[in-house]
A protein has these predicted regions:
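Transmembrane helix-loop-helix hairpins at membrane boundaries of multipass inner-membrane proteins
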Residues: 2-3, 21-113, 117-127, 209, ...
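Residues that define the loop-to-transmembrane-helix transition and helix capping
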Residues: 2-5, 30, 123, 143-147, ...
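Central hydrophobic cores of alpha-helical transmembrane segments in multi-pass inner-membrane proteins
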Residues: 5-20, 35-49, 101-115, 132-134, ...
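Hydrophobic/aromatic positions within or immediately flanking transmembrane alpha-helices
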Residues: 8, 30-33, 101, 126, ...
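Functional transmembrane alpha-helices
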Residues: 11, 94, 144-162, 254-301, ...
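Alpha-helical multi-pass transmembrane bundles of energy-transducing inner-membrane proteins
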Residues: 25-26, 131, 135-232, 236, ...
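Juxtamembrane/interfacial segments at transmembrane-helix boundaries in multi-pass membrane proteins
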Residues: 52-88, 188-261, 292-310
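Short juxtamembrane and helix-loop transition motifs at transmembrane-helix boundaries
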Residues: 85-92, 107-119, 140, 240-243, ...
Length: 345
């Protein structure tokens, strides 16, 4: 089995073990979860030590520039005149994702250790924790946009329940606010994903594809497709590629979060249980930044270059706004939330 697949789905295996164990053994749930995260950390370190560097692995728009790749046919539908829809289970890593995999594995171990303080409904908590673990790892390894989107959305449900059920006094408010913010961005991300799918063809099959690596290569866009560079298509009077970049950027900026899309984070940090706060600060915000680098900059590089000043300005505003607000806080978690806004800026 591919080691990335094993890394992603190990939490599912341990989750099934927890699910099958009786409640009388609930004291063992935390040790099982810790073992799962330690195994992931060990595998991440092994992957890092065996990661190859050099000119041959430079770039992002060819599949052979990624490592530990596994590509399997997953969903295949005949859409008649629209052709065949092929969705692949496609995972692999490059220099960006390998660093984040190791960091994520370490943070998950720390979060698992901090879960010792959880006393109620242990089975539910650790099952949701492991589901979140799987989704996070899947995001960093996915090279198929549909698969990426699936893992990206899968993070939302466990986080919603972890905050809403084990959080503080205002946990329901914080959980719903987080859910609505993220859902708003996800709906628009879905629209751009479909547009990209209809714009890109796989040179090997001639069919439309969700393959993110193919989306990063301008040669794979149909001439008159909505996101073709040569097509110069417009949406509401604006260049279609600019609209696509902005919509995806907003979706990921909510997760970063970038000012003024940050207001869900202080509430979520304060109300979330400590293990979830660790994951929010240490992993979730980085996923937003990863999405901007991997997808926004990877698929729409010319738009990112043109708008570099405005992106930089947003970053500076987030840095200063987050820092000054962090200085004014007396609650430690709220201070960490605002400092995270500053750091991500």
């Amino acid at each position: 089995m591919n080691i990335l697949t094993l890394l992603i789905f190990i939490p599912v295996l341990f989750g099934f073990i927890i699910m099958l164990l009786p409640s009388s053994l609930r004291s063992s749930f935390k040790y099982i979860t810790l073992l799962a995260t330690l195994l992931q950390l060990g595998m991440s370190i092994w992957i890092y030590l065996h990661f190859k560097t050099g000119v041959a692995y430079g770039g992002i728009n060819h599949e052979d520039q990624f490592q530990f790749v596994q590509k399997l046919p997953w969903i295949s539908l005949n859409l008649g005149s629209m052709g065949k829809m092929q969705i692949d289970y496609f995972v692999g890593i490059d220099g960006i994702s390998i660093t984040l995999l190791v960091m994520t594995s370490l943070v998950l171990v720390i979060a698992a250790l901090s879960s010792w303080e959880i006393k109620s409904n242990l089975k539910g908590f650790f099952l949701l924790f492991l589901l979140l673990d799987m989704a996070v790892m899947g995001v960093f390894c996915s090279l198929d946009f549909f698969l990426f989107y699936l893992f990206y959305e899968l993070m939302l449900l466990p986080l919603y329940f972890l905050i809403g059920m084990w959080g503080g006094a205002r946990r329901e408010y914080a959980a719903i606010k987080f859910f609505l913010y993220t859902l708003f961005g996800s709906v628009f991300m879905l629209l751009v994903m479909v547009g990209l799918y209809l714009s890109v063809t796989d040179p090997a099959t001639g069919n439309h594809t969700f393959n993110m690596v193919q989306m990063m290569n301008p040669a794979n866009y149909s001439a008159q497709s909505i996101f073709s560079i040569a097509g110069h298509q417009t949406i509401l009077g604006m260049p279609a590629r600019t609209v696509g970049f902005v919509v995806l950027f907003i979706a990921f900026a909510i997760k970063v979060p970038v000012v003024p899309l940050h207001t869900w984070l202080p509430d979520a940090h304060v109300e979330a249980p400590t293990p979830v706060s660790i994951i929010l600060a240490g992993i979730l915000l980085k996923i937003g930044g990863y999405g901007i680098i991997r997808i926004c900059l990877g698929i729409f590089p010319e738009v990112a270059t043109t708008g570099a000043f405005w992106l930089g300005l947003l970053g500076v505003i987030s840095i200063l706004y987050g820092a000054f607000n962090a200085l004014a806080q007396r609650d430690l978690k709220r201070m960490i939330a605002y400092s995270s806004v500053s750091h991500m800026g």
